[in-house]
Structures are given as C-alpha cells and as structure tokens.
Curated annotation (Swiss-Prot):
Pfam families for the chain: Ribosomal_L5, Ribosomal_L5_C
Sample GO molecular function, one term: structural constituent of ribosome
PANTHER family: 60S RIBOSOMAL PROTEIN L11-RELATED
Membrane-spanning segments: none
Disulfide bonds listed in the record: none
UniProt KW tRNA-binding keyword: yes
Gene: rplE
Protein name, entry field: Large ribosomal subunit protein uL5
Length: 180
C-alpha cells in the first residue's frame, strides 16, 4: 500500500474527524483523483510536438496520457477543430498516492525559489489546482533528453465540501502551503 494512503487511513482521517466533527465516516474528505494536464500550444504548427509532451507525461506518471483535441476552431489562435492541442492523465488509487508523495517530497522542493504553494488556488468546491512551470522538477525527466521546457497543471480532486476541509486534507498529506 502507498505510504500516503496508509497515513491517510491511520492518521489524517482521525484528525479531520476530530477537527470538523463528522458523524459518519463516509463524510470525511478523501482524495478522489489527480488530473495532470499539459497544454502544447506549438502543436498547431508542429504536430510532432505533441509526441514529446506525451512521452514526458508518461515518464512522470507511469501511465499513458490521452491526447486532447480542440473543441472548436478559434481563428485568433490559428486553431482548427479536432487538432491535437495537449494531453492529460487521470491518476486514481495507489498510483495517485505515489504521485502525490513524489510531488510533495521530491519535485516541489526542487522548484527554484520555492516558498510553498499558494493557499488560494482552491475552487470553492474543495479542489486544488497547482501550476508547474517546468517538467524538470521531476527526477524521472533527464535534462539532456528534453526538447523544450513545458509546464503542466495538476488538479487534485477531493470529496471535501469546502475549501477549508480540502486544505486540511492536503496539509495532512504534507502539502507545503505558503503563509500569507
């Protein structure tokens, strides 16, 4: 079993129940999934660019990403409907906990000038979004093998009803929130 999953089951659940006073154990917030999205803007001119992004995301997550396509044409962006414009991966279960563990303990500390993640990136429904500027912070990515520095969005979807509950859940996992 993943280290963070064990920590959740043994410590975090009890702490959340004590703090928020849940009557039913099914009310306790839990991490549902982590979605990692990589937008590849240059894919409109160069269709091969998407392959490198897919490879990077596969190396980081250990799961094959799905290529996302444009929903509609936008002339200002030189975008046609159905063109590949990015890729995303949805992690659940043990893979999700393993990824979160690596993100918190290995990748985030490698970010330059890192003072913690923003505590304001919650969406009001208990989901947290984190933007990363470069894929190099993950140790699985080799510096010499990449063609271009790419960023990604990481969305942590929880079953929490409010941002406060979700913040406590992620803090329990060890997410380093910045103090205002």
């Amino acid at each position: 079993m993943a280290r963070l999953k064990e920590k959740y089951l043994q410590e975090i659940r009890k702490a959340l129940q004590a703090k928020f006073g849940y009557k039913n154990i099914m009310e306790i917030p839990k991490l549902e999934k982590i979605v990692i999205n990589m937008g590849v803007s240059e894919a409109t001119q160069n269709p091969k660019a998407i392959d490198n992004a897919v490879q990077d995301l596969m190396t980081i997550t250990g799961q094959k990403p799905v290529v996302t396509k444009a929903k509609k044409s936008i002339a200002a962006f030189k975008l046609r409907q159905g063109t590949s414009i990015g890729c995303k991966v949805t992690l659940r279960g043990d893979r999700m906990y393993e990824f979160l563990d690596r993100l918190i303990n290995v990748a985030l500390p490698r970010v330059r000038d890192f003072h913690g993640v923003s505590p304001n990136s919650f969406d009001g429904r208990g989901n947290y979004t984190l933007g990363i500027r470069e894929q190099l912070i993950f140790p699985e990515i080799e510096y010499d093998k990449i063609d271009k520095v790419r960023g990604m969005d990481i969305v942590m979807v929880t079953t929490a009803k409010s941002d406060e509950e979700a913040r406590e859940l992620l803090r329990g996992f060890g997410m380093p929130f910045r103090e205002h």
